[in-house]
Design a protein with these regions (language model features):
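Conserved glycine-rich cofactor-binding loop
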Residues: 10-12
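Conserved glycine-rich Rossmann-like NAD(P)H-binding loop of the short-chain dehydrogenase/reductase
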Residues: 24-41
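Rossmann-fold cofactor-recognition segment
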Residues: 46-64
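Conserved mid-core segment of classical short-chain dehydrogenase/reductases
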Residues: 82, 88-104, 147
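Active-site helix of classical SDR
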Residues: 118, 154
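Residue(s) in the substrate-gating loop at a strand-loop-helix junction
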Residues: 138
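C-terminal helical subdomain
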Residues: 178, 193-230
Length: 245
């Protein structure tokens, strides 16, 4: 049995991942903004076999509550073996171009809060000499594109941060997993036209669980995004700047 903290637990990907943890009898501590949604998810996870499920209401911008969150999770579960950081928003690129305040808010949620929380977790797991920190980044962070460069920049920051954190914690027995989903069919992407490259939250969840259980450092999910993003990163800047991406 693993004792797992899930932050952003009301997101579709996080909920699907939690269901897979519950099915094998793990103990879960859920954190998110909506108390009502957290309680509903917790009740469902208990029915699916979770050994224990408790909740903590928090907004990702409440940095001063990160330490109390980890303290509460550890006290509730009797310690932590792993954490999945899955919170975030899908930035409105056009709106961010018109509002520096909105741009800052989006970066706070999608990058700064993730890094701050990872920092708290890193210190705790380093002290105990073990643990897994899994963080949802995105393929959008591999190269900035005009359609979503605010979101992409935040995810690029998360990817770079987790890379450095992984190097720092490796000698301490702590694993850091960077998760890079592509297009995923969730309520957050409901307005988007779907196609062959789209994945379901459950298929992404399956990849996340395998990565957290195994030895992977960075995963693309679905896996076909790895060669796709290699191609996109390889396009010369003189050509790339002319593309409509």
């Amino acid at each position: 049995m693993q004792r797992i903290l899930i932050v952003g637990a009301t997101s579709a990907i996080a909920e699907s991942t939690a269901r897979r943890f519950a099915a094998r009898g793990d103990a879960l501590y859920l954190a998110g903004r909506s108390a009502e949604r957290l309680q509903a998810i917790a009740a469902d996870l208990k029915l699916r076999g979770a050994a224990q499920v408790d909740c903590f209401v928090i907004d990702a911008r409440q940095f001063d509550r990160f330490a109390p969150l980890l303290q509460a999770a550890s006290a509730s579960l009797g310690g932590l073996d792993a954490a999945l950081i899955a919170h975030g928003t899908l930035s409105d690129q056009a709106a961010c171009q018109q509002s520096l305040e909105l741009l800052r808010e989006e970066f706070d949620v999608n990058a700064i809060s993730v890094m701050a929380l990872c920092g708290e977790l890193a210190n705790q797991f380093e002290a105990q000499g073990r643990g897994v920190i899994a963080v949802i980044s995105s393929v959008a962070g591999d190269r900035g594109r005009q359609s979503n460069y605010v979101y992409g920049a935040a995810k690029a920051a998360v990817t770079a941060f987790t890379s450095g954190l992984r190097q720092r914690l490796y000698p301490k027995g702590v694993r850091v997993v960077t998760i890079k989903p592509g297009f995923v069919s969730t309520p957050m992407t409901a307005a988007f036209k779907k196609g062959a490259l789209w994945a379901t939250p459950d298929s992404v969840a399956a990849d996340i669980v395998r990565a957290m259980d195994g030895g992977k450092a960075v995963i693309y999910t679905p896996g076909f995004w790895r060669p796709i993003m290699w191609i996109i990163r390889s396009v010369p800047e003189t050509l790339f700047r002319r593309l409509k991406l």
